[in-house]
Structures are given as structure tokens and as C-alpha cells.
């Protein structure tokens, strides 16, 4: 038997308990930042408890004065009763305000911290999670942590103090009454035990289901045009109903057990209350206590019962906290990007910005986490005042190469450097820190809600109107922006609403040009433009006096003859095409 118990305990330590302990330590790292707030909240709670207990004693005296069991000044006792009642209200409201104020502050600080950590998490690892799941973890789980940090330990101290102080008063006047008041504790403990595992499982499933529902709604609202175009309204409505049905069934399944437990707890509460009431009547009848003392006992009996229930309720609260901590730890403990070269990159840019900055990547090999090999010994180079094109069928690795250039992905083999102009003597390793040297225009619509000017200034806060207009001209966007009634102050709706795809692409390119980064990456960023406009945009970039390096990915070979070099991505390599091959591509397009 002893060996079996030890085996079970070992299993618990290696499993749930070990995991919960690790999650608790993670919460503690945040909790110790706010120890002053926790002390303030605890002190307010203790003062409130003290005022409440003194009010019970004064209430006893007041009843005894009225019933004639005690002589005293009725008016002064009544005034004291009112005074402590008002004090209790003031302390309660002050505690509530302080709790709300501190909780909001802590919540925003923790969310900011989690948000910052999410943004520097390894990109490929982060893509394993749906964006709806990430938002749910950041919002709901982070709020749960902030609330728990402020409330859990202070409430443990407050409820324990309330229980012990009330119990001490009851024991002082009538130890037997304390037995009746504490009668429900063993039953509460026994009934709460089967709920704990179910509660943890339910909380985990509930969090996962909430994330799934949020992700579904987010995707549906983001793709309303597609849903309407394919006449999928009924399909998506039924799919939402199915998800909601699963969620409701999960909640009701747990609620059935909760109701049964609640009914049993209520019955036990009635038994305890009426036992205390009966014992109080008997003691009054036998002249052992006064009416005032019985009134105080009944009040303190409720305090004892509520304190025990409050302490028991901290257990599911702790479980919920550890689950939220675990969900956040899944994200923030993923590999983090290294930004230790920020200072070196800034200095490098400052020294060589006038001559321009290029890149040189040699013998790269890269395989995704899922085992898909994309590159093997691939090489690419691009220098200031050059336009370098990457061509190839979809899925061959054009976008992956741009991710390698941006250090969103790290090659398993090979070397990648940023260089001063075309000088291979002055180079710096590519890393997340070198992203500040790039302007990136990805596939699709990347405009934000707001005005055109606000979109432009997202990348350069101090940009003047003249600089914005100049960037719009380079991207061939000023022609249509100039004709708008509000010009650069015209409103851009969500996802570039109000503008055609071609116009939105030109605005995105203008925003990237405004940043005046040494290297410009265009990932199919001209796909919605007609050939003439596409060539004009690229020529403008090439003829600009700013020493910019430009790398474009494209499916259309019609602009390749204005590029300095063209790399064909095939067979996991980047091969430079000669003029004959480029001409053949243009002819067969």
C-alpha cells in the first residue's frame, strides 16, 4: 500500500503538480513587481474586516441595552454603531476603488510586457498558433494573471484573518457554538475535492474553445467579401452554430456537477445555520447568554461560513491562474529573437548610408520545422542602385528567401551579410537587428485604417507633407491622390477600403519609399499594377538619387529587362539568368 501511495505521489509530482508549481513560479515573477500594491490592498481588507467585527460587538451591546440585559448609553452606542457602519462603507469603497485602479494599471503593464515578448518571439514558432488564439491568450489570460496577482494572496490573508478573528470571538464567549459554526467545513472540503480535476480540465477546454470561436469569427469578418462571393453565408452560419453547440454542451456538462455540488453545499449551509440558531435559542432560554450575544453569534456564524467558502473558492481561482500562466508560457517561452546587434547596426548604417548598403548571402540551406526543404547551397547578392528580381513558380521559395533576408527565418547552413555598398571588406552579419535597414512591401493589402498621411507617417513620424507627396510621386500614386477632395488627408478604410488593389499597392510602396531604408523588398507588390505602371514605378526607384538596393519577387517577366540581375529559384537554388533566358521568359509569358 505504501509503495502504491509513493508511486501515485511521484506521478503527481512529475505531472500536474510539477507543471502547476512551474506555472506558479512564473506568476511569482510578476507578483513580486507589485508587492506594494498587494500590501495596500491587504491592509484595506484587514481594516475592513476589523471594522466589521467591531460592528458585531457594538450590535450585541445595542441589542442588550434595548432588551434590558445591559445598562448603558443607548444614544452613544447607537451613534457608535452608525459610525462604524459608515466607516465600513468608506473602507469598502476605498478598497474597491484602489483594487480597480491598481488592477487596471497592473493589467496594462502585464499586457504590454506579454505583447512585447510575443513580438520578439521566433516567427516560425509563432506561426504554429492561430492569430485568434494568440489574441485570446494575450487579452483573457493576461487579464486573469493580473487580477490573480493582485487578489489571490491578499484575499488568502484577508479571509484567513476574518476566519481566525471571528472564531476567536466565538470561542471566547461559547466554544460549543464554534463547533456548530464549523460543522460544514469537513463537508465543504470533501465536496470540493472531486470538482478540482474537473475544474482544471473544464478551464483548459473552455480557454481552447474560446480561442477557436474568436479565431473563427475573426476569419469570417475579415473575409466577408469571399464568403458572399462564394455564397457561403449558410455554410458559415451553420458552422458557427456547430461551434457554439459544442461550447454550450461543454459548459452544461460541467454545470450539472456544479449544480449538484451547490445543492449539497446549500443543504449543509441550512443545517449549520439552523443548528447555530437552535443552539443560540437554547442558550438564551437557559439564561446562559443574552439576546445581543445570540445576535452576534448568528452574525459571526455567517462570517465563519462565508470565510471558509471564500477560502475554498481560492482553489479554483488558483487552478484558473495556473492554466492561464501555462497558456502564456507556451508563447513567451518559445525561442526569442536576438536584438543584441542593434547598436552595431545603427552605427554601420550611419557610417555607410551615403554610399548605400547591399547584401551578400552565400550557400544558404534552409528546411522548415515541418521538414520541407526549400534551399540547398543557394546564393544571392544585391547592391545599391540595383534592382534584383527573384522569379520562379509559386511555392519554390521566393517569399521564403525574403524571410531569410529579413531574418524572420535563420538558415541552417551558409553565410548572410549586410555590406557597405559592394564592399565585401566591410560587412555585418544579418540578424533581427538588421531589419531596420529594410523597407518591406508584402503580398496583399497592408494599408491600415486612418488617413493616407497617417499611414505614411507610421513608418516616419516626422515626415513632412512634401516628403509624403514626393514618395507618392515615386510610387506613381500622387496622380490619383492629388485628385481626391482631401488629398493626403483622405480616409483609408480597413484593409485599404475605398481604393482599388492597384492603388492600395502603390500607397504601400510609397510608404516603404518614405522610410528611406537602404534596402527595399517588394514581394509581388506590383502584381495588381498594369505593366506600364509597374515598369514606371521600378524605373522611378532605380533613377532615384537615394542609394537604394531593391529586390523584387514577381511572376511577370515583362519587367525583367530593366533589372540588373534576375535569379531563377529552382531545384532549391538561386540561378542567375542570362539575357537569352530572360528574353525567352518574356516571349513565352
Report the location of each language-model feature.
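Transmembrane helix-loop-helix hairpins at lipid-water interfaces of multipass membrane proteins
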Residues: 38-94, 98, 172-176, 287-291, ...
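Cytosolic ends of transmembrane helices, especially the final helix of ABC transmembrane type-1 domains
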Residues: 232, 256, 304-334
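A hydrophobic transmembrane-helix motif
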Residues: 51-60, 153-196, 249-298
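Membrane-integrated ABC transporters
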Residues: 1-51, 67-77, 95-99, 103, ...
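An intracellular "coupling" helix at the cytosolic face of ABC transporter transmembrane type-1 domains
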Residues: 36, 123-124, 140-149, 153, ...
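Conserved post-Walker A segment of ABC ATPase nucleotide-binding domains
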Residues: 403-473, 536, 540-547
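ABC-family ATPase nucleotide-binding domain "signature/switch" substructure
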Residues: 400, 439, 444, 455, ...
Amino acid at each position: 500500500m505504501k509503495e502504491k501511495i509513493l508511486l501515485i505521489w511521484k506521478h503527481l509530482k512529475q505531472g500536474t503538480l510539477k507543471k502547476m508549481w512551474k506555472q506558479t513560479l512564473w506568476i511569482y515573477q510578476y507578483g513580486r513587481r507589485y508587492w506594494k500594491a498587494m500590501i495596500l490592498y491587504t491592509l484595506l481588507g484587514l481594516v475592513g474586516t476589523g471594522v466589521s467585527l467591531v460592528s458585531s460587538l457594538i450590535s450585541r451591546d445595542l441589542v442588550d441595552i434595548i432588551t434590558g440585559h445591559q445598562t448603558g448609553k443607548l444614544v452613544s452606542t447607537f451613534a457608535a454603531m452608525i459610525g462604524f457602519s459608515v466607516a465600513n462603507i468608506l473602507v469598502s469603497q476605498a478598497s474597491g476603488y484602489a483594487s480597480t485602479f491598481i488592477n487596471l494599471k497592473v493589467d496594462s503593464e502585464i499586457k504590454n510586457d506579454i505583447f512585447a515578448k510575443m513580438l520578439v518571439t521566433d516567427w516560425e514558432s509563432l506561426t504554429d498558433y492561430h492569430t485568434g488564439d494568440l489574441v485570446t491568450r494575450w487579452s483573457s489570460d493576461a487579464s486573469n494573471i493580473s487580477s490573480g496577482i493582485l487578489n489571490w494572496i491578499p484575499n488568502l490573508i484577508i479571509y484567513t484573518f476574518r476566519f481566525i478573528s471571528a472564531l476567536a470571538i466565538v470561542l471566547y464567549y461559547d466554544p460549543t457554538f464554534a463547533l456548530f459554526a464549523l460543522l460544514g467545513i469537513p463537508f465543504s472540503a470533501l465536496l470540493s475535492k472531486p470538482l478540482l480535476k474537473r475544474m482544471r480540465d473544464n478551464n483548459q477546454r473552455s480557454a481552447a474553445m474560446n480561442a477557436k470561436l474568436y479565431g473563427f469569427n475573426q476569419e469570417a469578418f475579415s473575409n466577408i467579401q469571399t464568403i458572399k462571393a462564394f455564397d457561403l453565408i449558410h455554410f458559415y452560419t451553420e458552422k458557427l452554430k456547430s461551434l457554439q453547440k459544442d461550447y454550450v454542451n461543454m459548459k452544461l456538462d460541467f454545470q450539472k456537477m456544479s449544480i449538484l455540488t451547490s445543492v449539497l453545499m446549500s443543504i449543509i449551509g441550512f443545517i449549520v445555520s439552523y443548528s447555530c440558531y437552535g443552539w443560540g435559542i437554547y442558550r438564551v432560554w437557559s439564561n446562559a447568554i443574552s439576546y445581543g450575544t445570540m445576535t452576534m453569534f448568528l452574525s459571526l456564524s455567517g462570517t465563519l461560513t462565508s470565510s471558509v467558502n471564500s477560502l475554498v473558492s481560492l482553489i479554483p481561482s488558483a487552478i484558473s491562474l495556473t492554466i492561464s500562466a501555462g497558456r502564456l508560457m507556451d508563447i513567451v517561452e518559445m525561442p526569442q529573437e536576438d536584438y543584441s546587434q542593434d547598436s552595431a547596426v545603427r552605427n554601420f548604417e550611419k557610417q555607410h548610408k551615403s554610399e548605400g548598403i547591399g547584401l551578400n548571402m552565400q550557400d544558404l540551406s534552409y528546411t522548415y520545422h515541418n521538414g520541407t526543404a526549400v534551399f540547398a547551397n543557394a546564393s544571392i547578392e544585391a547592391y545599391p542602385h540595383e534592382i534584383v528580381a527573384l522569379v520562379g513558380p509559386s511555392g519554390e521559395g521566393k517569399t521564403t528567401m525574403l524571410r531569410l533576408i529579413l531574418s524572420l527565418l535563420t538558415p541552417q547552413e551558409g553565410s548572410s551579410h549586410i555590406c557597405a555598398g559592394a564592399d565585401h571588406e566591410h560587412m555585418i552579419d544579418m540578424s533581427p537587428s538588421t531589419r531596420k535597414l529594410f523597407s518591406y512591401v508584402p503580398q496583399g493589402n497592408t494599408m491600415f485604417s486612418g488617413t493616407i498621411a497617417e499611414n505614411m507617417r507610421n513608418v516616419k513620424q516626422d515626415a513632412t507633407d512634401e516628403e509624403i507627396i514626393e514618395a507618392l510621386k515615386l510610387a506613381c500614386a500622387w496622380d490619383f491622390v492629388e485628385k481626391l477632395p482631401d488629398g493626403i488627408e483622405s480616409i483609408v478604410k480597413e484593409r485599404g477600403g475605398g481604393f482599388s488593389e492597384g492603388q492600395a499597392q502603390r500607397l504601400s510602396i510609397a510608404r516603404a519609399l518614405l522610410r528611406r531604408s537602404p534596402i527595399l523588398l517588394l514581394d509581388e507588390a506590383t502584381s495588381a499594377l498594369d505593366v506600364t505602371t509597374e515598369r514606371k514605378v521600378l524605373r522611378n526607384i532605380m533613377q532615384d538619387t537615394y542609394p537604394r538596393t531593391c529586390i523584387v519577387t514577381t511572376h511577370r517577366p515583362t519587367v525583367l529587362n530593366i533589372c540588373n540581375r534576375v535569379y531563377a529559384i529552382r531545384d532549391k537554388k538561386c540561378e542567375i539568368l542570362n539575357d537569352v533566358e530572360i528574353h525567352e521568359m518574356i516571349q513565352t509569358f
